[in-house]
């Protein structure tokens, strides 16, 4: 890719500090750095066209650094995003670094809605590509907070759900429960969220059962009936009422039967299956302790 390398060589030369008469002739540092960034962007796009994504990401990064130095942070934020897009398929860790630079610029400029969008993307890369669930949880929650500040409740819920689900899978049940409560608060009274509410109540109660807190689970079930009249008689309500009693009685067989019957008509997803298995195991462990 000789053409891209030639452009980079010209950009590097442009980016060198000028002094004296040369500085006056070239229009000052800002103009010189802007020219360098344009050359880097042109080279980066050539790398992108030839599918040399790591090289494209590196070159977009250099362009963004020139833009920052020139005082053009708005443009730099966009260019760091372009670097992220290139790195995403080739170097996920570097992709996260580029996106963090972009987010820092957006939030410094007060663009929290945009920052939230990319915080969510950042968390997805950390969860899916890097399996860094700790950082993913933190960034999903921050995305949810920023969306909440912007009154984008549906988007806020989407981010909080991701964080809560990861918390529960990591056995941080009370942290997960706190977020599910927040999600429910955002959703009660919203006609579009009516069917989702049942799922949120189910997840919240399962977290309490997994934490061996049947009192909190029963209290949550009663609150659900008060907050959402349609919850009474739903399959989620009937399952919870049954398995809470099964846990209290230490009846593993009844618990398994109730879960099996529910799953026949409302297929349980991987998250619910995992948490329900943990609850079942906890009943068995209590039985063993009593023997």
UniProtKB/Swiss-Prot annotation:
Q: Where in the cell is it found?
A: Membrane
Query: GO biological process: any one?
Result: SNARE complex disassembly
Q: Pfam families, per this entry?
A: SNAP
Which keywords label this protein? ER-Golgi transport, Membrane, Protein transport, Transport
One Gene Ontology cellular component? cytosol
Q: Does the keyword Protein transport apply?
A: yes
Please indicate if the UniProt record lists Transcription as a keyword.
no
Which CDD domains does its entry note? SNAP
- GO function terms (MF aspect): ATPase activator activity; soluble NSF attachment protein activity; syntaxin binding
Describe the family membership recorded for this protein in Swiss-Prot or TrEMBL.
Answer: Belongs to the SNAP family.
Function in brief: Required for vesicular transport between the endoplasmic reticulum and the Golgi apparatus.
Q: Which PANTHER family match?
A: ALPHA-SOLUBLE NSF ATTACHMENT PROTEIN, SOLUBLE NSF ATTACHMENT PROTEIN SNAP
> How is this protein named in the record?
Vesicular-fusion protein SEC17
Q: Which organism is it from?
A: Eremothecium gossypii (strain ATCC 10895 / CBS 109.51 / FGSC 9923 / NRRL Y-1056)
